């Protein structure tokens, strides 16, 4: 094992268990920092050990409450830079605000993915590490190097182990996810591919209209980058079962699971939802028998190690 003494890992409050698991994989202790609130609710941060000339990694997904977690990340980066860290890498397992990545037609709306990226760069973070960005082009919003790594090796290994490839078909829940679904299907012995054509009348409401592909008597594996209210997912499962699917499972990286998501999943025809721990599960989600969680700790720890010691990251992760 290479000398790790110049590598320090700090964490905000958004996902402490993941940060601790990453530290365990790296064989380093968690950096000492106070991350709390003043009496008026403002973020209070104090770095409680020397970071001078150290390679520092800050682990903080910007999941709900998104504004608070983003602010924690920004203040942590600022505190570390002012404490003379040699470099600070923002490790953002789930990059919040990423779904607002463009203006639709003539809508008078912000591009909040760009806003969040600019804020992180303004704090002079030296690098960003994230997992499965909602859209690859978000990388262009950052003015610093960014490594967007993929959870697909972890998910693929679990699909092989749990379901194999016999009688299996990979399903994209919408037209926009076809590239991701095709990549997964290719690595599952060129499994068949189906596409769900959905029409969304308004945000977080989806209506499944048509299925392109033959799912009769097959195990359907839905793949996507995130699940929010699970409305689309549950409607897709119902449509697939209606078309004769034997089993419907979903492999999704980021378990946002807001609002009625857990109830929707419990009451759906979905057989299993497999997610990662880029976002911590709520108490309700942890007790849901249909939800199973895999850990990205080993993937992120290996990536952090490679960044810290100047090794290739792209050779490790395959889209």
From Swiss-Prot:
Q: Which residues form the active site?
A: 198
Return the InterPro entries for the record: PRib_PP_synth_CS, Pribosyltran_N, PRibTrfase_dom, PRTase-like, Rib-P_diPkinase, Rib-P_diPkinase_bac
**Which cofactors does this gene product need?**
Mg(2+)
Q: EC number(s) on record?
A: 2.7.6.1
Q: In which pathway does it act?
A: Metabolic intermediate biosynthesis; 5-phospho-alpha-D-ribose 1-diphosphate biosynthesis; 5-phospho-alpha-D-ribose 1-diphosphate from D-ribose 5-phosphate (route I): step 1/1
Which CDD domains does the record associate with it? PRTases_typeI
State where Mg(2+) 2 binds. Answer: 174
**Protein residues bound to D-ribose 5-phosphate:** 200, 224, 228-232
**How many and how are cofactors bound here?**
Binds 2 Mg(2+) ions per subunit.
Which Gene3D superfamilies does UniProt cross-reference here? 3.40.50.2020
One GO CC term, this protein: cytoplasm
Q: Which UniProt keywords apply?
A: ATP-binding, Cytoplasm, Kinase, Magnesium, Metal-binding, Nucleotide biosynthesis, Nucleotide-binding, Transferase
Q: Subcellular location, in the record's words?
A: Cytoplasm
Which residues does the record give as Mg(2+) 1 binding sites?
A: 134
Q: Which GO terms describe its biological process?
A: 5-phosphoribose 1-diphosphate biosynthetic process; purine nucleotide biosynthetic process; ribonucleoside monophosphate biosynthetic process
Q: Where does ATP bind?
A: 40-42, 99-100
Listed under catalytic activity are: D-ribose 5-phosphate + ATP = 5-phospho-alpha-D-ribose 1-diphosphate + AMP + H(+)
Q: Name one GO molecular function term.
A: kinase activity
Q: Family assignment?
A: Belongs to the ribose-phosphate pyrophosphokinase family. Class I subfamily.
Q: How does it assemble?
A: Homohexamer.
Role noted for this protein: Involved in the biosynthesis of the central metabolite phospho-alpha-D-ribosyl-1-pyrophosphate (PRPP) via the transfer of pyrophosphoryl group from ATP to 1-hydroxyl of ribose-5-phosphate (Rib-5-P).
Record's protein name: Ribose-phosphate pyrophosphokinase
Q: What's the encoding gene here?
A: prs
